[in-house]
Amino acid sequence: MIKKSFLYYFLLLPLWVQAEQFQPAITDTTWELINTPIECSLSQPIRDFGTARFGQIAGHPFSLTYTTNTQPSKKGSVTFEVAEAPWQNSEQRQDLVIIQTKQGQRVFHIEGVNARQALNHINEGRFPTIFYLSQHSNQEINVLMSTVHLQDFLPKFETCLIDLLTYSFEEIQHLTINFELEKYELGELEKVALMRVVKFVQADPSIRKIALAGHTDNHGKKRLNQALSDNRAAVVKNFLMDNGVPESLITVASHLELIPVMSNKTQTGRAHNRPTEIEIFR
């Protein structure tokens, strides 16, 4: 692989003579892997340029991102391409997508199908690359990823993508657990929603607080509503703790009927005013 990669870079010089090239050194190509239930990342440092990164965050699209510390773009466009490997007996390059760039842009990003195609191509020995005009160069620059040592990391990266949680932090950051009239038992759907919270909290060490707030409608006496509001928050807290969420992360408040979501004058409105609200903070 190393000899083939070296030969390929050599053969490319006449084709891209008008472009200043940035690429990992053949003998110094490294990969950095992040493998968690909420983030998968496979990145490669590129000397004198920055990094190239395949990645996905839970609940978000798969992406390919080039980030530069040294070569901000001119206003124009960046072309994402895939270059053929030399053993395929072809000097052709395949365009993936062309996107507009702003003056001074340092991050070049594609996602979804195009990014996944780039990963498939590099797995087959081809070379993902970008072209654009840099503020610090009189000619177009070309940035290539290397395939060297890729197979040492790719299987773990693919496994991480398979195991990635399917929902984002934003989807569980604000959650409403509803209750029936004068009840504080959790239904099956509510338990499923809370287990999503549990799994995310257990996977994300940056979460610092889970705030619970119990509510009631204005049906019944205040003393009874106070107990009901407390019990609704408590049953959610206990469910979280029973499934492994540390008590130190959880705060509890009881608002009774003081902060209604809808008017208490209708049955529908009162039904919406009986939740325990959950807000999660990083």
Give a label for each model feature:
Residues 20-77:
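An ectodomain-focused feature that recognizes extracytoplasmic/extracellular
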Residues 216-282:
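Periplasmic OmpA-like peptidoglycan-binding domain that tethers envelope proteins to the cell wall
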Residues 65-97:
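Extended low-complexity, serine/threonine- and proline-enriched intrinsically disordered segments
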